From Swiss-Prot:
Quaternary structure note: Adaptor protein complex 1 (AP-1) is a heterotetramer composed of two large adaptins (gamma-type subunit AP1G1 and beta-type subunit AP1B1), a medium adaptin (mu-type subunit AP1M1 or AP1M2) and a small adaptin (sigma-type subunit AP1S1 or AP1S2 or AP1S3). Binds to MUC1.
Classification via PANTHER family: ADAPTOR COMPLEXES SMALL SUBUNIT FAMILY
Database matches in PROSITE patterns: CLAT_ADAPTOR_S (PS00989)
UniProt GO cellular component terms: AP-1 adaptor complex; clathrin-coated pit; early endosome; lysosomal membrane; presynapse; trans-Golgi network membrane
The species this protein was found in: Mus musculus (Mouse)
Entry keyword set: Coated pit, Cytoplasmic vesicle, Golgi apparatus, Membrane, Protein transport, Transport
Locations listed in the record: Golgi apparatus; Cytoplasmic vesicle membrane; Membrane, Clathrin-coated pit
InterPro entries: AP1_sigma, AP_complex_ssu, AP_mu_sigma_su, Clathrin_sm-chain_CS, Longin-like_dom_sf
Function: Subunit of clathrin-associated adaptor protein complex 1 that plays a role in protein sorting in the late-Golgi/trans-Golgi network (TGN) and/or endosomes. The AP complexes mediate both the recruitment of clathrin to membranes and the recognition of sorting signals within the cytosolic tails of transmembrane cargo molecules.
GO molecular function: clathrin adaptor activity
Protein name per its UniProtKB record: AP-1 complex subunit sigma-2
Expression across tissues: Widely expressed.
Coiled coil: none
Length: 160
């Protein structure tokens, strides 16, 4: 996989993950071009399209489009399944994920993606293992926040 983009029906980019080195200018150009291309397609059209020397695989879930660019020899159906698995992981974590979950918890959406995909390839096929890793990271984060909470001198010596 070269990259994954999540964008709304209005064309607003919500998440982007690039697995190939490109300049910011090139990324913006690609994003703009692909968003326009995908949004212009009719709902009954095929979810695969040839674009430049890549294949684009996309799927719409509610108000979000999940769009991936893959190499010519990669399998479109597996990519569609990868998109679906990512949506399932988001659903499990957020409990029926919506666009607002992605907007306000984008770092979690990226973290889930990073636990699932590594370098554009599936790292972990088990939803259970991915969710367990995310729960453990959440616990670590909570523990770190508790450790940062300043305590009074009386609490330190056990007088409260």
């Amino acid at each position: 996989m070269q990259f994954m983009l999540l964008f709304s029906r209005q064309g607003k980019l919500r998440l982007q993950k690039w697995y190939v080195p490109l300049s910011d200018k090139e990324k913006k150009k690609i994003t703009r071009e692909l968003v326009q291309t995908v949004l212009a397609r009719k709902p009954k059209m095929c979810s695969f399209l040839e674009w430049r020397d890549l294949k684009i695989v996309y799927k719409r879930y509610a108000s979000l489009y999940f769009c991936c660019a893959i190499e010519d020899q990669d399998n479109e159906l597996i990519t569609l399944e990868i998109i679906h698995r990512y949506v399932e992981l988001l659903d499990k974590y957020f409990g029926s994920v919506c666009e607002l979950d992605i907007i306000f918890n984008f770092e979690k959406a990226y973290f889930i993606l990073d636990e699932f995909l590594l370098g554009g390839e599936v790292q972990e096929t088990s939803k259970k293992n991915v969710l367990k890793a995310i729960e453990q990271a959440d616990l670590l984060q909570e523990d770190a926040k508790e450790a940062e909470t300043p305590r009074s001198v009386l609490e330190e010596i056990g007088l409260t």
